[in-house]
Design a protein with these regions (language model features):
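Extracytoplasmic/secretory soluble proteins
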Residues: 1-218
Length: 218
């Protein structure tokens, strides 16, 4: 006994075996009178998932980015700055978090961004630079997103931020937990982390270290 519907990744070739055995129902006749799904079935990207010219599943619409940029709003207020709306304003915030003593302790001991060696968190910056995750059509070819000019521009910008000292120098040694601990402890004014249900937990951890701290999300 098998379920009527199930989730499956097209990268797993098992579905082709099941389709060949007649276990799966081809969906082409069921969607021929639709507009949106039929267009997907006929797209170039979807042709590689057919078995003998027939389709056996529809794509799942999922959220590309569930990450958020957390920052110390109390630091921004203390420095007399508004929430950044442009990349230039974002850079100005990082500079101020690094150079203008936002925690008020009279020491040069803060920096703009706390990162880890896991690069996936950078997806929060993708839209700023026009990066589209996955494979992008370039003429008659497809190009992985990390090979695009947009992604390279993002890396070049991050390299500039690193050379300016706005990113922790040893970030590549950090685990994700260490990245967060630096933010909790007030060493950095900004970090990347999960959104949704994670927000309350991150805010409470920051307030454990400093009850007057305020955290907001970009």
């Amino acid at each position: 006994e098998v379920p009527d519907l199930f989730f499956f990744l097209p990268s797993n070739p098992q579905y082709k075996v099941w389709a060949g055995l007649g276990v799966l129902l081809p969906l082409d006749d069921l969607v021929k009178d639709t507009k949106y799904v039929k267009e997907i079935f006929e797209s170039d990207q979807y042709k590689t998932t057919t078995v003998n010219g027939e389709h056996y599943f529809v794509p799942l619409i999922s959220m590309q980015n569930s990450h958020a940029i957390y920052y110390r709003k109390d630091w921004l207020d203390k420095l007399g700055m508004e929430e950044p709306k442009t990349l230039d304003e974002f850079e100005s915030m990082l500079k101020a978090f690094t150079e203008n003593d936002p925690d008020g302790n009279g020491q040069n001991d803060t920096y703009g961004i706390s990162l880890s060696k896991v690069s996936g968190w950078l997806s929060s910056l993708y839209s700023t630079f026009g990066v589209r995750p996955g494979w992008n059509k370039a003429g008659d070819k497809y190009e992985a997103y990390y090979m695009t000019d947009e992604y390279k521009n993002m890396l070049a910008w991050l390299a500039d931020m690193y050379s300016e000292g706005y990113i922790q120098k040893e970030y590549f040694l950090n685990t994700d937990q260490q990245k967060l601990e630096n933010f909790y402890a007030g060493k950095a004014g900004l970090t990347f982390a999960n959104s949704g249900s994670s927000v309350d937990g991150i805010v409470s951890k920051v307030k454990e270290a400093n009850q007057n701290a305020e955290v907001d999300v970009l």
